[in-house]
């Protein structure tokens, strides 16, 4: 919220705070690895030490599609729904992907009022995992 509020001035602070709290929850980011706490949302793991400093890895793939893109897309879905509701508008989103961007976008917009997503993908050019996420 603190960083977003520096750049988003057309959504009241209390609404923006509520949107970020709705987005970044353990329920949404529930795919933690063994040993990680889902409440951390983006767990920080210490892998070792290099030159006297800890070598750390920030986990960004605990979202619904296991892609780091969930970190932004989930918020974007909630922002779209909020703004469209306030304006009384709807939106159709047309995308094309051969990877996890499409599934992250689809999951982020799933169930959002006034948002429809149409995603194109190349026939036979996606991994089995990516196809399973998309269809």
Q: Where are the language model's segments positioned?
A:
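PLP-dependent amino-acid enzyme catalytic core
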Residues: 1-135
């Amino acid at each position: 919220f603190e960083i977003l509020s520096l750049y988003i001035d057309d959504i009241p602070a209390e609404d923006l705070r509520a949107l970020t709290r709705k987005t970044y929850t353990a329920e949404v980011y529930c795919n933690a690895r063994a040993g990680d706490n889902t409440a951390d949302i983006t767990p920080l793991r210490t892998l070792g030490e290099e030159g006297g400093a800890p070598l750390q890895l920030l986990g960004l793939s605990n979202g619904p599609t296991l892609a780091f893109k969930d970190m932004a897309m989930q918020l974007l879905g909630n922002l779209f729904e909020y703004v469209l509701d306030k304006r009384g508008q709807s939106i159709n989103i047309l995308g094309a992907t051969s990877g996890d961007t499409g599934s992250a976008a689809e999951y982020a917009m799933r169930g959002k009022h006034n948002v429809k997503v149409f995603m194109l993908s190349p026939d036979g050019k996606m991994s089995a995992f990516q196809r399973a996420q998309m269809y």
